[in-house]
Amino acid sequence: MSGTGRLEQNKMIVRRLVYEVMNAGGLDIIDEIYAPKLANAARNWISPFLASFPDTHMEIVDLIAEGDTVVGRFKCSGTHLGEWRGHAATGRRFTRVDEVGIFRIEDGRIAQAWSLEDTLRRMDQLGLR
C-alpha cells in the first residue's frame, strides 16, 4: 500500500471510533479498531462515558496523519443523564467542548492513545464547578 493509502486508512480507523463508537454507541466495534492489549481499557473508559452522556456527539474538526500516528481535534457535545466522575446526572447539556486525541496505529488498529480535553469547560456547562 502506498504511503498516502496507509495514512488514509489510519485516519479511517479514527473516523470509525468517532462515528461508529462515540456517536452511534457501537461498543461492539471496539475490538475491531483497538489492538487486543488496549481494547478492554478503551471499553472501560468509553462505556461509562456513553452511559453518562448517551447522546454524545463528536465532530471531527481536524484529522492529520503522519507515519503511524493520527492526531485529531474534536468538538464534543452531550447531555448529562447518568453519573459522571461521582456527580449525579444534572440533565444539562455541554456543547462543543474541545478535545485532542493522538493515536498510534499498528496493524490496522489503535495500539496507543492519548487525549486532552477541556474538562473544566464541560464541568462549567454542566453546573458542576
Predicted segments with their positions:
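C-terminal and inter-domain tail/linker signature
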Residues: 1-129
